[in-house]
């Protein structure tokens, strides 16, 4: 996949809820790899921006798969972590309003209120449960991508 496979508004699929994955198959692993390729291709076309994360719906696959950059600080670190069926199990901290961008909403940034801390439950590519305690930018990114899985843009 390339950046051209990333769908944008007003594509109606972005407003549809993604389906839960019950078994991690080779197709799911391939999808995560293709999503990573598309995110990195998008990033390579923008020298001063990073691709923080991507949800499968953004490449027109209505499955609850999210990739999240392993290191937001270094663009040279091109590794992403895959989360399958991510769900927020706890909201914590204060609600903070800050600007967000989206690969599916070209050239528009908007202020969005998000919890400063969350806890997320998901599966990894081995089908094992993972739990993440996130705060700050990671918490914001995870809430954004989980919104995508729920058909929210």
What is each model feature region?
Residues 1-153:
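Positively charged
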